[in-house]
């Protein structure tokens, strides 16, 4: 396939055209006074969104050279979203500002590689300054403020604060669509896993089709149980204490299942058999979690234990076990608190070291089941487009809140970026072009506040000058401009706060992508082929 090439200034200008097209569409959504963007879908109603990364992901340009610039900028937005879950519009605005100023000085003869080195050194200093100014999340009010800022909706902010308070910072919160028009919340207490009862005959509540056992003894094994002889010794010991007996195993079938069902129908034993959750190594880990939560032992041949060797001491205990045909919940396991805490710390350590997003998600779920709980936020709306837009905002706000709990918060409204600018004065560089890179960063860091003000119909330069003057007069670095009220004041006190993780990720990713664009000297793409005109079908235009 033949290629076409652009070099030097022509190449960089083509990239900039692509960057500008994406950034100009995305930055209209910045801030509480930002506008929505409607995205056409080939089928169904258009998507109306206030989310920067959703807008960026939809953009594909016809010109292949411009499209390269667009895709690079999308990478800055997407990476920020992946790491912090929010801040995509800020990253896009910063990257565009750096590219715009950088291309001017490169065209004037500056060395692009030295410029990039200055940008990279500056970014390191900025990230350190942003982290140093962090304030930990103190209470529910801080969480509500972070979520409200992200979603531009106080109802969503209060909802997320309430749910997070209930399940704890290690809890799992998922967002689903609801059939109604309002928000709904669902909580799951205890440990729930997605395996239900093996036989419908085990149901204790016919109306709700649930099997509910109080204070049961729980046998946990990774084996398949087919013969009743394997569990008869432990069954006889359990019956001396209680009738309530739960089996969590790879499977229970054949004679073993038939005997349990018959004896349940006779009233001899109230048995519940459930398949073990997960597969492979994950199943072993989850069974171990259940064992620690309930104070039992996993009976496994891997550790030299057979089912007929199980004793009462090997069985777990819980206040209640409830099973439906789809899932099982263990409420108030009687496990040792110290052992549960040790297991939680072990899972946290695994989360910190894993590189796989899938593994991290599964570990987070296990952690939530042991440590906190599971909550579902159901989003409702009158129409389909509004529902999707609302769900996006709830997901963004949730990500921003988690990021805030993790690394702390800084003043929002673009103030944290302006406050970080003096950190660039301490960066030592050897070459003049590196200093130019630092100068570009100084100008770019003001851009988010300029755009926030512009979206609110104000003059960005005047707002920035007033913010700096008031900060100096009052000796308060948290002072900024509230675009909703049109008033100056402490951003922290007004609840206008951003997570540190979001702010630093936006800076890092914007500098990374802008540096790549500024140091590009050639672009290569395929020459589009002219498609031959379609030939008319056989017998076209003839009468028969």
Curated annotation (Swiss-Prot):
Gene3D superfamilies: GroEL, GroEL-like equatorial domain, TCP-1-like chaperonin intermediate domain. CDD domains: GroEL (cd03344). SUPFAM superfamilies: GroEL apical domain-like, GroEL equatorial domain-like, GroEL-intermediate domain like. Its main location: cytoplasm. Pfam families: Cpn60_TCP1. PROSITE patterns: CHAPERONINS_CPN60. ATP binds at residues 29-32, 86-90, 413, 482-484, 498. It is found in: Cytoplasm. Its EC number is 5.6.1.7. It catalyses: ATP + H2O + a folded polypeptide = ADP + phosphate + an unfolded polypeptide. GO terms for molecular function: ATP binding; ATP-dependent protein folding chaperone; isomerase activity; unfolded protein binding. GO terms for biological process: chaperone cofactor-dependent protein refolding; protein refolding; response to heat. It comes from the Bacteria. The keyword Cytoplasm applies. GO terms for cellular component: GroEL-GroES complex. Keywords: ATP-binding, Chaperone, Cytoplasm, Isomerase, Nucleotide-binding. Forms a cylinder of 14 subunits composed of two heptameric rings stacked back-to-back. Interacts with the co-chaperonin GroES. PANTHER family: 60 KDA HEAT SHOCK PROTEIN, MITOCHONDRIAL (PTHR45633). Together with its co-chaperonin GroES, plays an essential role in assisting protein folding. The GroEL-GroES system forms a nano-cage that allows encapsulation of the non-native substrate proteins and provides a physical environment optimized to promote and accelerate protein folding. Belongs to the chaperonin (HSP60) family. NCBIfam families: GroEL (TIGR02348), PRK00013.1 (NF000592), PRK12849.1 (NF009487), PRK12850.1 (NF009488), PRK12851.1 (NF009489). This is Chaperonin GroEL 1. The gene is groEL1.
